[in-house]
């Protein structure tokens, strides 16, 4: 299938354009460079069949020839995905060698692993498994097509990757000096949740490989700041799970971790009391419904319940609860319900807890295993 036949997807009632991964760019650049090296002819457009079954037709840029090598670039198009790599040039340099076989390495702007991570050894270029295979197959196809009797050295480099890497999770994933060459399908789908959840899983897996069986989860910067400023924790064993609380718990179970402690602002965590495990506002809200119901259970009158339902922020709701003398009891039952849903999601194989706070009032409540989990994390 050609890219133009599958260039849009529907997300949240909007038509959004797909793009292609850094892995596809690297493989296409390698194929084009190999074709020019072994044929002696210039290639201005290259085709690439992606693992997803979509065929790309990409413009070849920045062609440079030397005696025994050719380099060129493909410009990445992320489609409508909010991606820091959109528009960068991914280069491949192919050099002939008389001996059969192929080497593949990363140059400037391609990160290197500082430790063993998944299938990658320390010191290796951060070119993931599927892109490695795509690149090798692309070059091999040209070796066979033009009947070259030797081998090839392949170098992938992304000059802009050095600066872009500073905006990514790579340093936390044990990758330094540049970005990763990524992609399992070859295609970037707009607003893909998969990339985020894979990063969360990888961070947790690295902790496990380092021997850690417990860690903190935080939905975002508020949780990280609270860990550091209020709890005095340096975040070494804290994984930012964004809105994907349920997925992060599933990851912990999958990795056979012993315990997770979720620390977050009431604006996110209160939703869990309603069983909401993806806390993005687009998925569900339920903040005021939860607070109103639990306030009613604590003895709130109809007027108070209605006032809570009219609130726009949890700060407003907390002010009402505090003024009515209902805050402590409301938070107690909210935390009980949060614990119920977290425990139900985690099952019996992993301990899980939650500590909820607000900027103005500090700690609002905690589940029964919080103190135990904090000691285990250290």
Sequence positions of predicted segments:
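Residues within well-formed alpha-helices
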Residues: 25-28, 32, 247, 251, ...
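Surface-exposed flexible segments
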Residues: 89-91, 230-234, 367-374
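Flexible, glycine-rich phosphate/dinucleotide-binding loops
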Residues: 163, 224, 363
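Hydrophobic, Leu/Ile/Phe/Ala-enriched alpha-helical segments that form helix-helix packing faces
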Residues: 33, 131, 135-146, 203, ...
């Amino acid at each position: 299938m050609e890219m133009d036949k599958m260039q849009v997807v529907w997300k949240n009632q909007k038509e959004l354009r797909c793009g292609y991964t850094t892995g596809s760019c690297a493989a296409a650049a390698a194929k084009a460079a190999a074709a020019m090296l072994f044929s002696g002819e210039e290639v201005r457009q290259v085709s690439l069949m992606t693992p997803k079954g979509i065929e790309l037709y990409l413009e070849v840029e920045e062609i440079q020839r030397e005696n025994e090598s050719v380099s060129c670039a493909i410009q990445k198009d992320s489609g409508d995905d909010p991606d820091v790599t959109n528009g960068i040039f991914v280069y491949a340099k192919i050099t002939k060698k008389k001996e059969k076989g192929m080497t593949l390495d990363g140059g400037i702007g391609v990160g290197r692993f500082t430790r063993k991570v998944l299938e990658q050894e320390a010191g290796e270029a951060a070119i993931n498994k599927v892109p490695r295979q795509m690149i090798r197959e692309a070059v091999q196809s040209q070796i066979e097509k033009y009947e070259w009797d030797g081998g090839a050295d392949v170098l992938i480099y992304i000059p802009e990757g050095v600066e872009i890497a500073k905006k990514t999770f790579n340093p936390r994933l044990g990758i330094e000096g540049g970005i990763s060459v990524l992609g399992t399908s070859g295609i970037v789908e707009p607003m893909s949740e998969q990339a985020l959840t894979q990063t969360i899983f990888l961070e947790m897996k690295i902790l496990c490989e380092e021997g850690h069986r417990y860690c903190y989860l935080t939905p975002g910067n508020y949780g990280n700041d609270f860990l550091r400023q209020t709890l005095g924790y340096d975040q070494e064993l804290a994984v930012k799970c964004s809105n994907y609380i349920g997925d992060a718990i599933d990851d912990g179970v999958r990795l056979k971790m012993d315990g997770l402690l979720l620390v977050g602002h009431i604006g996110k965590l209160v939703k869990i009391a309603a069983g909401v495990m993806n806390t993005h506002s687009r998925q569900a809200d339920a903040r005021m419904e939860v607070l109103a119901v639990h306030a009613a259970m604590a003895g709130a009158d109809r007027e108070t319940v209605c006032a809570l339902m009219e609130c726009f922020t949890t700060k407003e709701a907390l002010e009402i609860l505090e003024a009515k003398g209902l805050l402590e009891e409301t938070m107690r039952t909210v935390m009980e319900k949060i614990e119920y849903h977290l425990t139900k999601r985690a099952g019996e194989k992993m301990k899980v807890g939650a500590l909820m706070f607000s900027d103005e009032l500090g700690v609002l409540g905690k589940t029964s295993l919080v103190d135990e989990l904090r000691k285990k994390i250290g």
